[in-house]
Amino acid sequence: MVSAMRSRTLSKDDVNYKMHFRMINEQQVEDITIDFFYKPHTITLLTFTTVSLMYFAFTRENTSQEDNIWKGILSVIFFFLIISVLAFPNGPFTRPHPAIWRMVFGLSVLYFLFLVFLLFLNVEQVKAVMYWLDPNLRYATRESDVMEYAVNCHVITWERILSHFDIFAFGHFWGWAMKALLIRSYGLCWTISITWEMTELFFMHLLPNFAECWWDQVILDILLCNGGGILLGMVVCRFLEMRTYHWASFKDIHTTTGKIKRAVLQFTPASWIYVRWFDPKSSFQRVAGVYLFMIIWQLTELNTFFLKHIFVFQASHPLSWCRILFIGIITAPTVRQYYAYLTDTQCKRVGTQCWVFGAIAFLEATVCIKFGQDLFSKTHLLYVFLWLFSVAVITFLCLYGMVWYADYCGQREKTFSECEDSTYNTDIPWHHIDKPVEAPVKQNEGTSRRKNRHKGKVTNGVGKK
C-alpha cells in the first residue's frame, strides 16, 4: 500500500518537467484584460453548432452531388476546428487569442490526415481530386517545359538584371524577413540561405528550374533578396527585444484612442526573448539537433518544388501559395517548441505542434517519392550523400563561428534566455516582464504623484490615464 502511494507521488523533477512542457505546449494567458473572451462557453457553443447544423441539413438543396460533397467537406472541417478549440492545446503562443492557435494546430492535424489519405490513392485518383478542386488544372503545364534556365549567363545587362525583380523576388525578400523573425539568428539564417542555394545545385538534375546563372544565385538571391529580408527581420527582432512589455488592461484605459491602440496591439507578441541556438557549453546533442533542424527546413523547401512539379501546377496557383502560407504559420509555434526542446535541459520531449510539423514534412516527401517514381528514378545517390555531407559541414562551421563570435567579439548583456542555458526558469515567468518596484506613497506626496502620473513611460503605445 505504501509503495503504491509512493508510485503515485510525483517527484520534484517530475513536477518541474510537467510544468516546463506545459509552458511550450499549452501556454496560459496570465494577463486577462477582457474576461468574456477567456471564459469557457462550451454549452453555448454546443447549442449554436447543433442548431446551425440542423438548420442547414434540412433547409438546403441537395440535388447537386458535387455541391453536397463540397458542403459536407467544409462542414467536417468546421466542426473539427470547433473540437480543436475545445480539446487541443494552446501551443507556445497566446496572442491574439489561444483559440486561434488551437485552430492552427487543428488545421495542421487535418493536413497531416489528408497526406495519409493521399498515400492510399493512385495517380489517377489524385489527379481526379485536383481536377475536382480546379478543372483548369487539366490544362496546366510545368514551368520547366515552357521556360529556359541558366541560358547566356555571360550576358549581364541592367535590363536583364531588372527583369528578375518580379513578384517572386518580392516573395523571397518578405519570406526571408519572416524566417528571420522565426529563427532570430543571423548565423542560422545565413547558413540556411547559403545551404539552400547549394541544395538547388545538388538537385538541379531533377528540377530544371533550379538551374540559375551565378550572378542570379549569388547577387540577386543570396545578397539582395535573402540578405535584405534577413536584415529587415533581425532589425525587427532587436527592436522587439529592447521593448518593455507591461501590458495595460482595458479596464485601466479610459480613453477611446487608448482602447483602440490596445486592441490593435493584441495582435502583437506578448513578449520577446533573445534566442541563442548555440554557446560554448553546448553538447554534441545540440549540434545534432541544429543539423536535424537544417535538414527538415531544407526538406520542407524541397517539398514545395517537388509537389508542384509532380502534380503539375504553377507557382502562382492557390494550391502552391496557400500551402506556403499555411506552412509558414505552423512554423512559428514549431520553431518555438523545438528551440525549447533543444536548449532547455528540463524539456525532455518536443511539443505537439513540432511533432505534427515533422510528420508533415516527411509525409510530403513520401507522397512526392510515391507519385514521382519516374522523376526520382533519375536521382544520383552520390549527389544526395554529398548534399547531406555539405549540410553537416556547413552546420558545424556555422555553429563554430557563432561560438567564436560569442567568445572573442564580446558577450551580449545576459537575458533571461541565456541564464543557465535554459529558456525557462521555475522562478521567473516565461515572458520575463520587468515591472518596476513602486515605492510606498507617503501621505503628503499623493497629490504630486497623481499630477505626475501622466508623465511616466508609455509602454506598448498605451498610457494609463
UniProtKB/Swiss-Prot annotation:
Biased composition (Basic residues): 449-465
Enzyme class: transferase
Pfam families assigned to the protein according to its UniProt record, in alphabetical order: PSS (PF03034)
GO CC, any one term: endoplasmic reticulum membrane
Keyword set includes tRNA-binding: no
GO MF assignments: L-serine-phosphatidylcholine phosphatidyltransferase activity; L-serine-phosphatidylethanolamine phosphatidyltransferase activity
Localization terms from the record: Endoplasmic reticulum membrane
Segments passing through the bilayer: 36-56, 69-89, 103-123, 187-207, 217-237, 287-307, 320-342, 356-376, 384-404
Reaction catalyzed: a 1,2-diacyl-sn-glycero-3-phosphoethanolamine + L-serine = a 1,2-diacyl-sn-glycero-3-phospho-L-serine + ethanolamine; a 1,2-diacyl-sn-glycero-3-phosphocholine + L-serine = a 1,2-diacyl-sn-glycero-3-phospho-L-serine + choline
Keyword field contains Metal-binding: no
Coiled coil regions, renumbered to chain: none
Family: Belongs to the phosphatidyl serine synthase family.
Function: Catalyzes a base-exchange reaction in which the polar head group of phosphatidylethanolamine (PE) or phosphatidylcholine (PC) is replaced by L-serine. Catalyzes mainly the conversion of phosphatidylcholine but also converts, in vitro and to a lesser extent, phosphatidylethanolamine.
Protein name: Phosphatidylserine synthase 1
Organism: Xenopus tropicalis (Western clawed frog)
Organismal lineage: Eukaryota, Metazoa, Chordata, Craniata, Vertebrata
The gene coding this protein: ptdss1
